[in-house]
Amino acid sequence: MTERRHDREFVRTFFTSPTAVEGEDDSAKMLRRAAGLRGMQAPDVWVPDNEDATAPSMRDEGAENIVEVISEQGAEFPGEIHPRMVWHRDSPETRYQGFQHMLDITDPERGAVEHIHGFVIPEVGGIDDWKKADEFFTIVEHEHGLDEGSLAMSVIIESGEAELAMGDLRDEMGKPTNNLERLFLLVDGEVDYTKDMRAMTPTGELPAWPELRHNTSRGASAAGCVAVDGPYDDIRDVEGYRERMTDNQAKGMLGIWSLTPGQVVEANTSPLPPKTGSWLLDADGEEVELASEDGVEAYDGDRLSLEATDGGYELRVGGDARELTADELREELLGLTSYVPSMDDIVDSMEEFEAAKEAGRGAIAMTQSATLRIGGTEIDIEKDRMWDEATYQAAMTPISLFQDVYENRPDQHEELEERYGAGVVERAMEVGL
């Protein structure tokens, strides 16, 4: 696995705030509000946004607001702070403006830089453009006597050029001619990416761009960075936001842009293992979570029915009815069901495998069993899954994420212990070490 060089191995949330709001008595009010977020409402990475979220006429004032708010409140903020500057691969003037703002913000005498972990650079192009941005970071560090490479650089992937540049990172990082090892987050920007690709949809909505998200996750994994999905702008569509995160997580992209504190809460909790395990049933193409009732997993819908007969069982799925023996029914139901393990389940399995490995066994069988009730008919099912070292390492990802969160976000300890129980949290912090 490629080494990651930053304090955070995982980033769940990337939350942007305008740096200056025109027409307000206090133009920095959105920054002050964001700086006061705590617990699950506070993001892992807060991005005071001096680019798209702030009007061009307000950006000089926005840079001053960043200094003022972060110097006053940055020490207490529980996440990392990475302001977004202006930059564009085709505009030297824009790049220079962003550079000047970085110089002003990082002046040690102004008191903000000690709380700033890095900067976010949008609209990057090919790998040479990434190197230009990196050189500006190095100049800023030298100008203010900061350690070279101490400011992390995150980029927004908003063009085909930037997408292709991710394939060059492994060859370029670590060369003595650059400090690209400062790279931290690779963040998708699907709106500008859609414009750059000249893509269209009949409704005018953004394409889903699963290929971009896969490529960004792959590029981040290969380069030791962290992948983050772009903004989900239908802020009332909570279920759609959750589905997007679930799809991303299967690609290894565990972070997502958050536009509101409500989205931050959803994104902070989504990649964490569930509090309780649950059984899922494929009911004629619709995935349904079964209701757990006194140790029985029950389905009472109308897409699937089960009745006992003299010779066995009749299973009806949609309009298709089949006569099955008990063994045939169990085999069929094993193909229609799946189990979502809880945090406690994952920790139990990992502890069991660690004990077996210590006893000299390289692989063991883990059994999952349940009593299903479909309509009024019950039947027991069980299946074995072989665990070896590869299975163990794959299962470690959600635990590693939890450990990273618990170590870096003490402001969330109380909520995590309420969610799982102090005993499960303690055990989860010990497995895999």
UniProtKB/Swiss-Prot annotation:
GO MF assignments: magnesium ion binding; malate synthase activity; metal ion binding
GO cellular component: cytoplasm
Pathway(s) it belongs to: Carbohydrate metabolism; glyoxylate cycle; (S)-malate from isocitrate: step 2/2
Keyword field: Cytoplasm, Glyoxylate bypass, Magnesium, Metal-binding, Transferase, Tricarboxylic acid cycle
Temperature remarks: Optimum temperature is between 45 and 65 degrees Celsius. The activity of the enzyme at 80 degrees Celsius is half of the maximum.
Active-site residues (renumbered): 388
Function of the protein: Involved in the glyoxylate cycle which synthesizes precursors for carbohydrates from C2 compounds such as acetate. Catalyzes the Claisen condensation between acetyl-coenzyme A (acetyl-CoA) and glyoxylate to form the malyl-CoA intermediate that is subsequently hydrolyzed to produce malate and CoA.
Family, per entry: Belongs to the HpcH/HpaI aldolase family.
The protein's name in its UniProt record: Malate synthase
Organism lineage: Archaea, Methanobacteriati, Methanobacteriota, Stenosarchaea group, Halobacteria
